[in-house]
């Protein structure tokens, strides 16, 4: 286009109008009429606001991609028999491919081991409670004790399991099983296995998901489980919770995204296997306090699982929490009041100003853990985005 400040007679080149060339030249005055009118103040404000929104959306999308591309490290902590390993099993069921037939067959030995350990504990409990098991069960009791001592569970004779099934109907055995707790130690899942003992003794028995979830195998090392939830990658590290293994925890404190701390609600009337005298609930609260008050974790989210809700609800019908906490003055069999009291006791170990995300869980309930972990994912995603300024 010719400049409007000269008087040359050179023809004005054709200009593009919606992609078509105009064949006739235009005067300077007609050319300036094609410019857009100035933007009104209100329109300009809306434009700037939309531009800011678009910029924020772009930033959020970049941060979400960053989260998707990274791996969130979850450190799973808690004392022995809190249910930590059950949470790991649930991740395998929910977010990996579950258990193969070969893995289920391999898990069978742990089911048998649990049954023998439960039967052995109850037999010993009968002695503690001065309950007599009839002599007709002498042979099966001897077999149970021998297997327990040798730890040979792989090729367990099914007749032994059938013998346990018969023994479980005996009145002394039943009374001992119902009066464990502070009297002697018993697996928290004992009722599950005793109620279905006939199925476990079948020749073609293959463990179900529930059987595997209820099976207790004490962690003695560190295990890592990698999985994804809606595109977000997680690495869950389960560290053994017994006293002798806690010195290993510090080796996994670096680059932690969050800590999942698990406490069993039903351990208030039990003592540690390690020393036979320390109350397990008191020990769990102490260890929780040691972790949450560590300077390493001042900026790390702490997610608390108050686990074994189902067993807790059953236990307080017989034994109230005042056996551990004399300052509890509510009804001994009131689930809600007992739960609120325990929650306050546990959280009182937090001497920092940081929030603790608390969930009441049943780790053997796949639906419950699925919902809880979705909430955990949302918490961690939101926290990561807030750290990115979103």
Swiss-Prot record:
| Domain (G-alpha): residue spans on this chain | 70-390
List all Low complexity biased stretches: 1-12, 22-42
A Pfam family annotated for this chain is: G-alpha
Tell me which residues bind GTP. 78-85, 213-219, 238-242, 307-310, 363
Ranges where the record places region G5 motif: 361-366
Q: Where is this region: G2 motif?
A: 211-219
**What are the protein's UniProt keywords?**
GTP-binding, Magnesium, Metal-binding, Nucleotide-binding, Transducer
Q: Where on this chain does Mg(2+) bind?
A: 85
A GO molecular-function annotation: metal ion binding
One GO cellular component this record assigns the protein to is: heterotrimeric G-protein complex
Region annotation G4 motif: where it falls in the sequence = 303-310
GO biological processes:
adenylate cyclase-modulating G protein-coupled receptor signaling pathway; gamma-aminobutyric acid signaling pathway
Does the keyword section mention Cell membrane?
A: no
In terms of domain of life, where is this protein from? Eukaryota
Query: What residue spans carry the region label G3 motif?
Result: 234-243
Question: Region Disordered: start and end of each range?
Answer: 1-42
Subunit structure comment from the entry: G proteins are composed of 3 units; alpha, beta and gamma. The alpha chain contains the guanine nucleotide binding site.
Q: What does this protein do?
A: Guanine nucleotide-binding proteins (G proteins) are involved as modulators or transducers in various transmembrane signaling systems.
What family, per the record? Answer: Belongs to the G-alpha family.
The protein, known as? Guanine nucleotide-binding protein alpha-7 subunit
Source organism? Dictyostelium discoideum (Social amoeba)
């Amino acid at each position: 286009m010719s400049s409007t400040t000269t008087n040359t007679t050179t023809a004005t080149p054709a200009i593009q109008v919606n992609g078509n060339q105009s064949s006739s030249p235009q005067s300077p005055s007609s050319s300036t009429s094609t410019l857009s009118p100035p933007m009104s103040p209100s329109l300009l404000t809306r434009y700037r606001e939309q531009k800011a929104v678009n910029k924020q959306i772009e930033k959020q999308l970049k941060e979400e991609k960053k989260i998707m591309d990274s791996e969130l490290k979850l450190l799973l902590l808690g004392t022995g028999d809190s249910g930590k390993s059950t949470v790991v099993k649930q991740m395998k069921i929910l977010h990996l491919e579950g258990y193969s037939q070969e893995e289920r067959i391999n898990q069978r030995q742990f089911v048998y081991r649990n049954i023998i350990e439960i039967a052995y504990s109850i037999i010993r409990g009968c002695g503690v409670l001065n309950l007599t098991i009839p002599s007709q069960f002498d042979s099966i009791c001897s077999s149970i004790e021998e297997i327990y001592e040798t730890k040979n569970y792989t090729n367990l004779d099914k007749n032994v399991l059938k013998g346990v099934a018969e023994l479980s109907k005996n009145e002394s055995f039943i009374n001992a099983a119902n009066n464990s707790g502070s009297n002697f130690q018993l697996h928290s899942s004992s009722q599950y296995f005793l109620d279905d003992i006939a199925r476990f003794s079948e020749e073609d028995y293959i463990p179900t998901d529930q059987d595997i979830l209820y099976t207790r195998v004490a962690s003695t090392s560190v295990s890592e489980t990698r999985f994804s939830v809606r595109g977000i990658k997680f690495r869950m590290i389960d560290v053994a919770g017994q006293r002798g293994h806690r010195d290993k925890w510090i080796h996994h404190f670096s680059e932690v995204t969050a800590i999942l701390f698990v406490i069993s609600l039903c351990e208030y009337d039990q003592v540690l296997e390690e020393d036979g005298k320390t109350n397990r609930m008191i020990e769990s609260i102490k260890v929780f306090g040691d972790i949450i008050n560590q300077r390493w974790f001042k900026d790390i989210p702490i997610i608390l699982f108050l686990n074994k809700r189902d067993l807790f609800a059953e236990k307080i019908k017989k034994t109230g929490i005042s056996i551990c906490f004399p300052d509890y003055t509510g009804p001994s069999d009131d689930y809600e009041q007992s739960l609120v009291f325990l929650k306050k006791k546990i959280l009182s170990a937090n001497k920092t100003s940081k929030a603790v995300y608390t969930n009441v869980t049943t780790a053997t309930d796949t639906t419950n853990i699925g919902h809880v972990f979705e909430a955990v994912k949302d918490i961690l995603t939101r926290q990561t985005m807030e750290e990115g300024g979103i």
